[in-house]
C-alpha cells in the first residue's frame, strides 16, 4: 500500500501534517495508560478505542507498529484508595489491572505490543533524574523531594501553546515552600511511613507521575519516537512535563507527533462524580452490548468531544444492527470480490488517511451494506464478495467482532436461556399435537422480537 499520503492533526504544531515515520514502514507509538486505582470509566473506553482504531488502521496500511501502553501502578491516588479499602497497594493494583484487561477485551481493544508497569522502570527513572540534576534542570528541596526547574527549559509550554509567565499567572498549583517556582513539579517524592518506597540517591521514595512515562517510553522506544498519544485532559500538565523532562535529559525531540483524543460529555455536561453522571465501563455494558458501545465511541472523529446519551447509544445500536443484517444469510467469500470493490476500499482509505475520519469511513461501510442487501436476491455471488470486503473493513475499525446470530441473541428482550426453554416446550407441544400451545409460544416470542425458524434438524431463533 502507498505510505505517502496519510495526514493527521499534530497537537504539537497545531495543524494537520503529512505523516513521515522515523524508520520507513515502522511506527513507534506510546499511549499513556490507566492509573489503576479504580474501575475504568467510559472516558477510558473512549480514549483507548480511539487509539485502538488508529493502531488497527496503521497495521491495515502495512506498518509494523510497536504500541507501548503503560500502567501507572504507583501513585498518590493508589496509596489513598488502598488505605481507604484497608488493603495493600499490590492487592488494589492487581485487581484493577485484571478488571481493566477484562473490559478492554470485551470492547475488542487489541493488546499493546508492550505494557510496562511504572514500578518495573524505577532504575531508569532514577537515572533520568540524576541526569537532570547534573544538567541543572532539577534540584532537591529541603524536605528531600526532587523538583524539575521549569524556568531552565526554554520551550516549556510549547505543547499547550502557553508561555511560562501566563501559566504562572493562571496557576492553581498549591504553593510548596521547597519549590523555587510554583510551576516546578515533583520528580521524586520522599516516602511517608508505611508507604511503598524504593531506594534512591535522595532517600527512600517513589517517582513523580510525569517522570514515569518519560522513562518507560525511553526504555522501550528510544529517545525519539514517532507518536505520543493520550487523552486531551493530559495535554497539560502531564504531556508538557514529559516533553520538558525528556528533551532536557536526552537533548533531542521527544515525540514527532502528538495525538489527543476528545473527552466524553454526558448529556452535554462534563462527566464527573459530583454531577452523578459518571459511568464505569462495566455499568455501561450492563445496558448495552460491547458492539454498540464500541461503535458509538468509534463513530466520532477521535479528537472531537463525544456526547454520551441514551439517544446516541440507541442510534449506535440501530447502526450496528444495520451492518449485521447486511451480513446475515450471506457467506463472505474473498474470491468473489467484484472488480469495482476497490472503489469502496479506496474511499475508506481516503477517509481514514485524512485524520482518521471514522464518520466518513463508516459512511462507506453503509454504502457497502446497502449494495449487499440489493444483491442478496439478484446476485448472491457478487453479494458474497462485497460481504467479504465489509467484514474486512469493519475489522479495521474493530467492529462486528461478535458472531452475527450470537449478537442478536444477546440483544434486548428475553433471556437466551428462557427462549431456549420456551422453544423446548414448543417442540414438546408439537410432539403432543398441542398446536394451540405451540402457536401461543411462537406468538409470545414474536411479541418480544424473537423469530423462530423451523427445519428438519430443529428450531433456531434470532432477534428480528
From Swiss-Prot:
<comment type="subunit">
    <text>Monomer.</text>
</comment>
<keyword id="KW-0030">Aminoacyl-tRNA synthetase</keyword>
<keyword id="KW-0862">Zinc</keyword>
<dbReference type="GO" id="GO:0005829">
    <property type="term" value="C:cytosol"/>
</dbReference>
<keyword id="KW-0648">Protein biosynthesis</keyword>
<protein>
    <recommendedName>
        <fullName>Cysteine--tRNA ligase</fullName>
        <ecNumber>6.1.1.16</ecNumber>
    </recommendedName>
</protein>
<keyword id="KW-0436">Ligase</keyword>
<dbReference type="Pfam" id="PF09190">
    <property type="entry name" value="DALR_2"/>
</dbReference>
<feature type="short sequence motif" description="'HIGH' region">
    <location>
        <begin position="34"/>
        <end position="44"/>
    </location>
</feature>
<dbReference type="InterPro" id="IPR032678">
    <property type="entry name" value="tRNA-synt_1_cat_dom"/>
</dbReference>
<dbReference type="GO" id="GO:0006423">
    <property type="term" value="P:cysteinyl-tRNA aminoacylation"/>
</dbReference>
<dbReference type="Pfam" id="PF23493">
    <property type="entry name" value="CysS_C"/>
</dbReference>
<dbReference type="InterPro" id="IPR056411">
    <property type="entry name" value="CysS_C"/>
</dbReference>
<keyword id="KW-0067">ATP-binding</keyword>
<feature type="binding site">
    <location>
        <position position="213"/>
    </location>
    <ligand>
        <name>Zn(2+)</name>
    </ligand>
</feature>
<dbReference type="InterPro" id="IPR014729">
    <property type="entry name" value="Rossmann-like_a/b/a_fold"/>
</dbReference>
<feature type="binding site">
    <location>
        <position position="273"/>
    </location>
    <ligand>
        <name>ATP</name>
    </ligand>
</feature>
<dbReference type="InterPro" id="IPR009080">
    <property type="entry name" value="tRNAsynth_Ia_anticodon-bd"/>
</dbReference>
<feature type="binding site">
    <location>
        <position position="242"/>
    </location>
    <ligand>
        <name>Zn(2+)</name>
    </ligand>
</feature>
<feature type="short sequence motif" description="'KMSKS' region">
    <location>
        <begin position="270"/>
        <end position="274"/>
    </location>
</feature>
<dbReference type="Pfam" id="PF01406">
    <property type="entry name" value="tRNA-synt_1e"/>
</dbReference>
<keyword id="KW-0963">Cytoplasm</keyword>
<keyword id="KW-0479">Metal-binding</keyword>
<comment type="similarity">
    <text>Belongs to the class-I aminoacyl-tRNA synthetase family.</text>
</comment>
<dbReference type="GO" id="GO:0008270">
    <property type="term" value="F:zinc ion binding"/>
</dbReference>
<dbReference type="InterPro" id="IPR024909">
    <property type="entry name" value="Cys-tRNA/MSH_ligase"/>
</dbReference>
<dbReference type="GO" id="GO:0004817">
    <property type="term" value="F:cysteine-tRNA ligase activity"/>
</dbReference>
<dbReference type="GO" id="GO:0005524">
    <property type="term" value="F:ATP binding"/>
</dbReference>
<feature type="binding site">
    <location>
        <position position="238"/>
    </location>
    <ligand>
        <name>Zn(2+)</name>
    </ligand>
</feature>
<feature type="binding site">
    <location>
        <position position="32"/>
    </location>
    <ligand>
        <name>Zn(2+)</name>
    </ligand>
</feature>
<dbReference type="InterPro" id="IPR015803">
    <property type="entry name" value="Cys-tRNA-ligase"/>
</dbReference>
<keyword id="KW-0547">Nucleotide-binding</keyword>
<dbReference type="InterPro" id="IPR015273">
    <property type="entry name" value="Cys-tRNA-synt_Ia_DALR"/>
</dbReference>
